[in-house]
């Protein structure tokens, strides 16, 4: 333990640690694990106090089992619930809005989560399969033999279209066209390394909003979303998309979700939903194209109409390349587990990458082995790409369904090869770990028997 009673960590100045995290996060975490073990502290600009990174599943079990907020308690910390570290809100609030589920706390967060959960689970998901498949087929059918491109960009196009048409239910072509133009611009601006430096500098200087320069983009997107909300309220037609279901949802007191809060939820789904799934898809193709044995096994299983290996491929890809590596919390009560004692008020985060690469949990942890997930499941809290507890990713089931459909559609219609030598390096993009060069691929040929096969291997929705 260090002098402040927290797990030890690097003694380098906060600025140096922050720069190392921004530029080489994997190397930083790996070196700290080798030196300090399963729990260590890092200091980041903008967070004020050290952040303790945790990778022991026993400790994560205790962290994720945080008690629900007391009824009526808006501030989760007042009831012993773990809350968000203040530093996290600085970069998210100006874009997501105060009503974003990512930023709400306590009973307010739980109430909103209960309202938003049903559209992303169970039978509701089945209504989205055909539309997602049509979007994927339309994109892949534009690919030509001999063409080379960064697959990450093509996956972004698919997942953005799925959010706009399947989740939002936008049908106005002018609105769709403008959102297709604006959202990638906003994502590029909020994901750049230079923006990270500007945000940290703004925090250091005490500026209220470090993202004013994005205001124009945000305002134009807001106008389009408010127009969609107003139009849908006026029509009052029952539909299966998520926006329609949220418009019809009611709180316990019978009131509806207001326009501003709806906007915040939609922007959160838009920015958090499509980019993370696109990144996960890009990583999956990168891993498959570097591991031809796994690719051939997957193709053979899909030919037989069996999607069990596809599900295993996705699970292994999310293990080896978790898209969101950290999910910070401020402890609302003491945490005692795995021989570790952390007092209430400590900022902590699961180090998902480190948990997923523990050799005691995953033999040969840096190798891509989908077979790990065929006949067994990892121990509790050893596989956490979607987080856990009351803040587990709301759209996890939707994302996995979308990944299954897109991967099967691509592999059934084209044959790909990697267009880059060696392993794609991990780059930090805002809160995600993305492929540094976008995963360059080449279309070797189109498959002659591709039409009609895209739905054949996708099993029942979980």
Which residues does each PLM region occupy?
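Cytochrome P450 heme-thiolate monooxygenase catalytic core
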Residues: 1-6, 72-93, 108-110, 124-279
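Conserved cytochrome P450 K-helix E-x-x-R motif and the immediately C-terminal K′/meander segment
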Residues: 18-37, 223, 227, 304-338, ...
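Conserved cytochrome P450 K-helix/beta-meander segment immediately N-terminal to the heme-binding cysteine loop
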Residues: 68, 350-376
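Cytochrome P450 proximal C-terminal region
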Residues: 6, 33-34, 136, 184-185, ...
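N-terminal membrane-proximal hinge/A-helix region immediately C-terminal to the signal-anchor transmembrane segment
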Residues: 1-98, 104, 111, 130-138, ...
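Cytochrome P450 catalytic-core helices
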Residues: 276-301, 397-414
């Amino acid at each position: 333990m260090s002098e402040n009673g927290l797990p030890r960590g690097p003694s380098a100045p906060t600025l140096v640690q922050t720069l190392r995290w921004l530029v080489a996060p994997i190397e930083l975490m790996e070196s700290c694990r080798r030196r300090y073990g399963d729990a260590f502290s890092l200091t980041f600009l903008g967070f004020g106090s050290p952040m303790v990174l945790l990778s022991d599943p026993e400790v994560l079990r205790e962290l994720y089992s945080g008690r629900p907020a007391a009824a009526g308690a808006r501030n989760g910390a007042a009831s012993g619930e773990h809350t968000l570290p203040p530093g996290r809100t600085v970069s998210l609030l100006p874009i997501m809005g105060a009503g974003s589920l990512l930023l709400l706390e306590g009973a307010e967060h739980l109430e909103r989560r209960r309202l938003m959960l049903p559209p992303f689970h169970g039978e509701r998901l089945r209504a989205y399969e055909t539309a997602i498949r049509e979007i994927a087929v339309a994109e892949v059918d534009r690919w030509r033999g001999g063409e080379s491109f960064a697959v990450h960009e093509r996956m972004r196009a698919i997942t953005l279209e799925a959010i706009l048409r399947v989740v939002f239910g936008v049908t106005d072509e002018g609105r769709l066209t403008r959102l297709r133009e604006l959202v990638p611009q906003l994502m590029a601006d909020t994901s750049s390394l230079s923006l990270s430096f500007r945000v940290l500098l703004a925090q250091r200087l005490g500026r209220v909003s470090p993202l004013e320069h994005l205001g124009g983009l945000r305002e134009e997107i807001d106008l389009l979303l408010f127009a969609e909300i107003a139009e849908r309220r006026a029509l009052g037609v029952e539909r299966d998309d998520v926006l329609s279901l949220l418009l019809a949802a009611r709180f316990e007191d019978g009131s509806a979700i207001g326009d501003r809060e709806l906007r915040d939820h939609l922007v959160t789904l838009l920015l958090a939903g499509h980019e993370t799934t696109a990144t996960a898809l890009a990583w999956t193709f990168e891993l498959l194209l570097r591991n031809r044995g796994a690719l051939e096994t997957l193709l053979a299983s899909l030919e037989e109409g069996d999607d069990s290996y596809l599900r295993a491929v996705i699970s292994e890809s999310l293990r080896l390349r978790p898209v969101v590596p950290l999910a910070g919390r401020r402890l609302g009560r003491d945490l005692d587990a795995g021989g570790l004692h952390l007092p209430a008020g400590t900022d902590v985060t699961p180090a998902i990458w480190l948990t997923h690469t523990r050799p005691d949990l995953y033999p040969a942890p840096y190798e891509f082995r989908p077979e790990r997930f065929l006949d067994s499941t990892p121990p509790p809290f050893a596989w956490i790409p979607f987080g856990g507890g009351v803040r587990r990713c709301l759209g996890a089931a939707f994302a996995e369904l979308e990944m299954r459909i897109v991967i099967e559609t691509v592999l059934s219609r084209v044959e790909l090869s990697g267009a880059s030598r060696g392993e794609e390096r991990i780059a930090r993009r805002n809160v995600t770990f993305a492929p540094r060069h976008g995963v360059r691929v080449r279309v070797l040929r189109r498959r002659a028997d591709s039409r009609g096969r895209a739905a054949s291997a996708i099993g029942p929705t979980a």
